C-alpha cells in the first residue's frame, strides 16, 4: 500500500507535534540547545488554541501584595481535590516566577501597574497564607488577551532559533517499535503527500479534546489528536473522567467569558437578583474554584432560579464596573459579549452557562514531560522516544480540577522542562535505527481504509451524536444510570464508525477526510472518558456523582489509567497519586475537606 502514496522521509533529532504555547516553548527550547528540531502543526501556529486564553498566567510574584510559591502550591493541590501529584505541582509553582520573567524578557506585553510592575489580578481558588488569608492577586495578565500575547511571542522565538515548521500537516500516527517511539507520520494537506518523520524524541503538544462535547469553549481543531495516537499505540491515558466545565460560557454560543471578569469584580446572579455564590462559597464567593461555581449555577437552574425565557442560564454582571476599567482590563470580553450575546456590558448583564473548557486528563507523564506507563510495581516506567506536554498531557498538576490561570503556566513550565530533558538525553544529529517496513505499512493501510470508506453514515451525523451524548450523559452532575447508558451509546457510536462514508477521495485539502480522522481520535477519548467516569464511585473535583456525593479518600486517591485493546474492550487500571513533595522546602499537603 505504501507504493500507492508519495511518501517523503525526514530525519530529525526531535519532532514536536502541535504549535500552541507548549509546543512552541518546547520546540525553540530544543533548537536553542542545538537539537535539529521540527514542528508539525495542522494549522498556522498563531491560530493554535492558546491564542484564545484570556485571563492570565499564575505566578507568586508578589507585585500586588505578599505572595509565596508555597501558597500557590497549596491552592493548586486543594484545587486538584488532592488528585494532583505534589512533586509535579511543586516543580510548576516553584518555577512559575522565573517562567514569567522569561516571558517578559522574550517580549510578552504584560499589563502594568502604575509603578511599572506586571499587573496581577485575583482568580478563583487563589489565596494567601495556605488558604487562611485573603484572596491572592497572582494572575499576570495582558489585558484579557494573555494567550494571544504569549503565543505570538513564543512563535517569534521559534523563528529566531530556526525551528523547522511543517505547517498544515496532519499527524496520523506514531511510529512505534518494540515499545519505543521512533517517529510520526503526517499528511501534508496542501499537496497530498505523506511524510515519515524519524525522530529520537516525539513531543505531543496537541491540546485537549473539548470537541467531544456539543458545547465547548474549544476551537473546532481541539480534537485530541495526540491522545488518539497514543491510544492506538496501545498506551494508556490518565484521569480522563475529569472534564472541566467553565462557569461562564456565553449562553447558546459557548464562547468563553474569562474568570478574570469575576477577578475584576464581576458577579453572578439568579432570577431573584441574588448573588447566589455567597450561599455556596461564603469566603471566596464568585471566585471559588471552577467546579464549585459550575455546580452552584447548575443547582440554581435546576431548582427554578435560572433566568431567561426557559430559565436555563444565569447572569454575569459587569455593568457596575467603570467603562474605563472594562476598556483597559477586559476589552476582548466587551467585544465578545456584544458579538455573541448582543449585550453592552456597561449597561446589561451577560447570559452565561457552564461550558466544557478543559481536560484535566491526558497522556500520563512525569514533570520532565516523558510519557510514563505502569509496568509491574513500577508505576512510572518511562516510554522511550515520546513526550507529552500541555493539555494533551496529564503530569498531573491539575488533578481533578484545574485552577484558572494555571494552564498557561503549565504550557511554558513543562514546555521548557521537556526541552531541557531532551537536550540531556539526545546527542545532536545522532543516527537513527532502521525501522521495520511493516510499521509504516500498517499506518498507511489505516489511512487508506478511512480515505476510501464507502459506508452509509456521514461523519458529521456521527460526530453530532457523540457530542450530544457526552453533553447529556457525562456532564456537570453524573449518576451511574446516566454514565452506564452513556457508555453503551458511545460504544455503539464508535462501532458505527466502521460504516462511515467519505465522499471526497482526494488528498489535497480534503476536509471530509480530516474530519473523519479527527472523529476517530475523539471517539476513542470519549469512550475512555465515560467508562472511567462510570467506574469512579465518588465525587472529586469536576467529577460530581449525585449517587456518590462525597469524596472517598480511602479508596479513590488514585489515578485512573484507561486504554482500549485490539478487540475494542476498555481496560481500566489504577496507580497511586504522588503525595510526597519534590524537595524539603515544603511539606506534604495532607487531604482535608475542600471549602471555599
UniProtKB/Swiss-Prot annotation:
Gene3D superfamilies the record matches: FAD/NAD(P)-binding domain (3.50.50.60), Fumarate reductase/succinate dehydrogenase flavoprotein-like, C-terminal domain (1.20.58.100), succinate dehydrogenase protein domain (4.10.80.40), Succinate dehydrogenase/fumarate reductase flavoprotein, catalytic domain (3.90.700.10)
Pfam families in alphabetical order: FAD_binding_2, Succ_DH_flav_C
GO CC annotation, single: plasma membrane
Oligomer and partners: Part of an enzyme complex containing four subunits: a flavoprotein, an iron-sulfur, cytochrome b-556, and a hydrophobic anchor protein.
Paired cysteines (S-S): none
Family: Belongs to the FAD-dependent oxidoreductase 2 family. FRD/SDH subfamily.
Key words, A-Z: Cell inner membrane, Cell membrane, Electron transport, FAD, Flavoprotein, Membrane, Oxidoreductase, Transport, Tricarboxylic acid cycle
Top-level division of the source organism's lineage: Bacteria
GO MF terms, alphabetically ordered: electron transfer activity; flavin adenine dinucleotide binding; succinate dehydrogenase (quinone) activity
GO biological process, one term: electron transport chain
Recorded topology in the membrane: Peripheral membrane protein
The UniProt record lists the keyword Translocase: no
Enzyme Commission numbers on file: 1.3.5.1
Recorded catalytic activity of this chain's protein: a quinone + succinate = fumarate + a quinol
Keyword Ribosomal protein: no
Protein name: Succinate dehydrogenase flavoprotein subunit
Subcellular location: Cell inner membrane
Cofactor(s) in the UniProt record: FAD
Residues forming the catalytic site: 290
Pathway(s) where this gene product acts: Carbohydrate metabolism; tricarboxylic acid cycle; fumarate from succinate (bacterial route): step 1/1
Ligand binding (FAD): 18-23, 41-56, 225, 391, 407-408
Modified residues (Tele-8alpha-FAD histidine): 49
Primary subcellular site in the record, as a coarse category: membrane
Chain residues that bind substrate: 246, 258, 357, 402
InterPro entries given in the database record: FAD-dep_OxRdtase_2_FAD-bd, FAD/NAD-bd_sf, FRD_SDH_FAD_BS, Fum_R/Succ_DH_flav-like_C_sf, Fum_Rdtase/Succ_DH_flav-like_C, SdhA/FrdA/AprA, Succ_DH/fumarate_Rdtase_cat_sf, Succ_DH_flav_su_fwd
